[in-house]
């Protein structure tokens, strides 16, 4: 498109719906559903639910980032991009990259380690309790202290989980900043 040419109302609406939908989904999954499920479900049931939800969530995030990048990238000749447009494209590329890392690499590894942990826990009769409902000493801490394999798997799980959480927060922040930019560019409400 030439400099200043309007991309059309439909493209603008699609861009806004995909971006805001992705951001809303990310807020819900990151800050609401995970905490509610963690506090309400038995530990292994929570893990099973998350292992089903996260692949879909990460792939939808990836798809939304890809769609938004495809909508925005061809709108202007690259030489005519403003600082904000370059920033927005960079944020969407970051979101796409982080969502891809989560969807294609981290999720599978995190789930595999979680299943290995759950297997050991099941052998010890653990995993059916809702987190936070312990009476007496923490049986998971005792298991960590006694079983070096379990302890190593747990560290590996938290390593992958931590990286995945950082990628997810990066996507959330990137999309949020893009939405802020769009909101600041509104001429009226």
From Swiss-Prot:
Keywords assigned: Membrane, Transmembrane, Transmembrane helix
Keyword Transmembrane: yes
A Pfam short name: DUF4149
Major place of residence: membrane
Transmembrane parts of this sequence: 18-38, 53-73, 81-101, 166-186
Subcellular localization(s) per the UniProt record: Membrane
Membrane topology: Multi-pass membrane protein
GO cellular component terms attached to this protein's record: membrane
PANTHER family: TRANSMEMBRANE PROTEIN 205
Protein family according to the UniProt entry: Belongs to the TMEM205 family.
Protein name stated in the entry: Transmembrane protein 205
Organism: Mus musculus
